[in-house]
């Protein structure tokens, strides 16, 4: 008994063989044409591969160029940063030296104006005389000291315009007959300022 499956397979093979024979009979050069088509396909694939490779090479070249440009810019920025840092360090050193020079000159200027006051105090102590003579010597020294302060543009803080917390320090509040409130009744210690800067506040009593 013949197996149906084997029979069907054999039938398919026979039919395919007849179709192939008919195709070759109608187109005797079919195999060559198929081969040519296959070669054309392979050639096209090679062309595509070559074009893709060229595109990748161009892209890689462009990337390398951009990378090199960025590296150069980075190096330029590093050099600029180093120069700025060096310039700032030099500027800081010059500024520190200038501040030190100004401070030294200011101290020297103050000492030059104060030393004569000390000289007069020493002379007053060295002279044998009466209390009145000593008083006159001290008064002269005070005047000289005040002249020195004036040359340094240091002035006494006034109390004529009433109590000012920016200029005066209230030690106590007192009642004073006939006096308006918030007036300076007494000065315990004079205050001084140079321009708008207070060097020492006046210590005062204030009326209620």
Swiss-Prot record:
Q: According to the UniProt entry, where is the signal peptide?
A: none
Q: Where is this region: Disordered?
A: 1-38
Comp. bias (Basic and acidic residues)? 1-25
What is the name of the protein in this document?
Protein GrpE
Molecular function in Gene Ontology: adenyl-nucleotide exchange factor activity; protein homodimerization activity; protein-folding chaperone binding; unfolded protein binding
This protein's gene is called grpE
Q: Where is the composition biased (Acidic residues)?
A: 29-38
Organism of this sequence: Clostridium perfringens (strain 13 / Type A)
**Which protein family is named in the record?**
Belongs to the GrpE family.
């Amino acid at each position: 008994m013949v197996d149906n499956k084997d029979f069907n397979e054999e039938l398919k093979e026979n039919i395919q063989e007849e179709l192939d024979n008919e195709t070759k009979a109608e187109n005797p050069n079919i195999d060559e044409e198929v081969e040519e088509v296959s070669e054309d396909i392979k050639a096209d694939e090679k062309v595509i591969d070559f074009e893709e490779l060229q595109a990748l090479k161009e892209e890689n070249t462009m990337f390398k160029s951009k990378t090199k440009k960025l590296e150069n810019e980075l190096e330029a920025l590093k050099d600029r940063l180093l120069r700025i840092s060096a310039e700032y360090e030099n500027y800081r050193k010059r500024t520190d030296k200038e501040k030190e020079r100004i401070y030294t000159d200011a101290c020297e200027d103050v000492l030059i104006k104060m030393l004569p006051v000390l000289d007069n105090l020493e002379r007053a102590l060295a002279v044998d005389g009466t209390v009145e003579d000593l008083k006159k010597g001290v008064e002269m020294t005070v005047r000289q000291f005040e002249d020195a302060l004036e040359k340094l543009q240091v002035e006494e803080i006034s109390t004529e315009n009433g109590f000012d917390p920016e200029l005066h320090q209230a030690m106590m509040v007192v009642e004073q007959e006939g006096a308006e409130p918030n007036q300076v009744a007494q000065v315990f210690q004079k205050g001084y300022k140079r321009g708008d800067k207070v060097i020492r506040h006046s210590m005062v009593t204030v009326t209620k």
